[in-house]
Amino acid sequence: MNELLKKNFFSLLLIVLFSLFIFSLALSDLTKSNKEKAWDCVGIYMANYFLPSGEKFEYGMKEKSMASVKVWKEYALEVGIKETDWDKGVNKAVDKHYGSKYSEKATNQCHSFLEATIPNGKDRVKKVAQTLY
């Protein structure tokens, strides 16, 4: 009986450890390609905020863009990306997109990517946007 108890205990322990391993993988760092795409989107969002004069846009788009920048950074820090590494990637993306014309298509693709990648991303952006001003 004692041997059966040990065997069940170790089986249960292995299942728990395996489950924790799988769960930690799900919450782990963004993949390299997703991180690059996130940075690119942050660059697009920042370019939206600093649109050159003469560009047509909705004010709400600027709010959503800035809220999205904040949500991406919060998420990056949550999954273990160092703040300095995140900021370096953001700076490169901002340099790439700064001064570019507004692209509704690119902005909407970034919103879709954020919502698909970040748990509760849409709600998080909405919540942050409500606190901006």
Question: Could you describe each region identified by the protein language model?
Answer:
Residues Y59-Y133:
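Compact alpha-helical subdomains of small soluble proteins
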Residues V16, D29-L30, F50, Y98:
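Generic detector of short alpha-helix boundary/capping microenvironments
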Residues M1, L5-K7, N34, E63:
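Generic cytosolic/nucleocytoplasmic N-terminal low-complexity/intrinsically disordered segments
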Residues L30-I81:
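Short N-proximal segments of mature Sec-exported proteins
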Residues N2-D29:
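Classical Sec-dependent N-terminal signal peptides that target proteins to the secretory pathway
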Residues V16, K35-W39, T107:
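Hydrophobic alpha-helical segments
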